[in-house]
Amino acid sequence: MEYFDMRKMSVNLWRNAAGETREICTFPPAKRDFYWRASIASIAANGEFSLFPGMERIVTLLEGGEMFLESTDRFNHTLKPLQPFAFAADQVVKAKLTEGQMSMDFNIMTRLDVCKAKVRIAERTFTTFGSRGGVVFVINGAWQLGDKLLTTDQGACWFDGRHTLRLLQPQGKLLFSEINWLAGHSPDQVQ
């Protein structure tokens, strides 16, 4: 289990100066050729998402105004807060900010031939399904994960096991992504 606080994470500026990324975790850890990766991006200007051939991207708007996503011949989609949207990361996708507002989003990318991610928003205590990887990010409220207290802009990632996240207040929201490995693949094969 690895814990993080978004306010203390290192920031990587984009080459086009349209935003920045905070990498949460990758599997395998510290590898450029990853099977899955979770990150938080701040987008300051209209522009294109980076291309990642062979990957699927699920993007969830955390803060800011709605964002319009356009892929030339595949889709037009308005990204609304806390509504995950998946698309192939090897296609050109343009993001247009609403009214020029800066936005912040959660991204999880998985290699299409190896694993699949599912992203949900939780508003009550729950236990993960025992997947072989996952990430949680606290949107608001206070949550207990094992002996660790997680609050707004904090989270954790893991590479194995079942975990219970207990909401400690009457209300709270948590973004939760779980990784499932496709038949014939296992994280044990790459560690």
UniProtKB/Swiss-Prot annotation:
InterPro entries: RmlC-like_jellyroll, RmlC_Cupin_sf, Uncharacterised_HutD/Ves, Uncharacterised_Ves. CDD domains: cupin_HutD_N. Pfam families: HutD. SUPFAM superfamilies: RmlC-like cupins. Gene3D superfamilies: Jelly Rolls. Belongs to the Ves family. This is Protein Ves. The lineage of its organism: Bacteria, Pseudomonadati, Pseudomonadota, Gammaproteobacteria, Enterobacterales. The gene is ves.
